[in-house]
UniProtKB/Swiss-Prot annotation:
Annotated PANTHER family: SECY/SEC61-ALPHA FAMILY MEMBER
Assembly mode: Component of the plastid Sec protein translocase complex, which is composed of at least SecY, SecE and SecG.
GO cellular component: chloroplast thylakoid membrane
Name of this chain's protein: Protein translocase subunit SecY
A GO BP annotation: intracellular protein transmembrane transport
Coiled-coil ranges per UniProt: none
Family: Belongs to the SecY/SEC61-alpha family.
Gene3D superfamilies linked to this entry: SecY subunit domain
Stored SUPFAM superfamilies: Preprotein translocase SecY subunit
Membrane topology, from the record: Multi-pass membrane protein
Record has rRNA-binding as a keyword: no
Pfam family name, one: SecY
Amino acid sequence: MSQKSDLRNRIKFTLLLLVLARLGIFIPVPGIDHDAFYASVEKNTLVNFLNIFSGGGFSTIGIFALGIVPYINSSIVMQLLTKIIPDLEKLQKEEGELGRQKITQITRYLALGWATLQSGAISIWVKPYVFNWNFTFVCESVLALTAGSMIIMWLSELITEKGIGNGASLLIFQNIVSGLPKNFTQSFFDANYSNTSIKFGLFIVIFLLMIIITIFVQEGTRRIKIISARQLGKSSILDPNSYLPLKLNQGGVMPIVFASASMALPAYLTQLTQNTFLLQVLYLFCPNGSLYLVLYSVLILFFSYFYTSIVMNPEDIATNLKKMGASIPNIRPGQATIDYLQVILNRLTFLGATFLFTVALIPFIIEKVAQIQNLRGLGATSLLILVGVAIDTAKQIQTYVISKKYDSMTK
């Protein structure tokens, strides 16, 4: 099979699975008065926030309403556990592919449990709109929603293994894109705004500015010069092509995905309790809450550092440089190199996280200043994920093409 044909088939396979994942959202869970439910939650801020990840699934309560969120949440928990539990860290690092498969299997079980809990919360939440709410309905709805979430998880893994790009990221990408037309029309054409054309122009300018900033954050790189043993004594001028690239945002799109998915948790929990005090506390961390931005910024910073620690280990980099006979000019090999790289990574991660949160803050400022409502659905979280996933997928396609070229050259 030719290189172009193989790539084309992978892209077709990916698109087919994305279409299947999208269709499942429109298959309703039986027993619910969906028209009454939709009319009730259409302008609900919490539901609109959750719809970012489900592509509108929480407005229709389709069998794929949970989407990929349970799998993402279980991945967060699993990655935290691998840092805390030595046996899991050893399993991930030292046992190769077999160890990674075991980690993946544990993550699936966690996703199953998480999906079951969320399904139960939804079955209680929709009680006022159910024709005959009883134990049988709860069991049936939990089974349908959990099965739908497991199917989505399976589709995401198939995309990652046999398609192009990261399956979970592409599914979220698709869900966000599917909601853009509705949010766009609500923001400008269905609302009674004065000076609509001026606000529309302002929105376009700011939207493009946010894209530029996002690309800068995703692609910004600090190049650390390195010199090999072969260069020593030959020339006092360093080869400009010999450098160690450290990205401004090592985690790519994942910190914002993890932070946003975590921010959905308070919204879920509000459906599980009727306690007035607990509801007041939870609402503080919901999209319109006074502590929402504070928690959001802390989570972005935390996941940026956390994900950087996973993908970039200064000790491993220093060891690999030593094996290659390379070093950083004016920095001693060994612990000095590790300390130097750690300081650089910490600074880059903080700067990258600050940029991410700045972009996340822009839609809130626009809503207050320009009085443009519903902008958050078109805003920071969505934009960061859209641009990040688009860049990552394009790079994966490019890497795939290059690797196939090298394979054909070596045969």
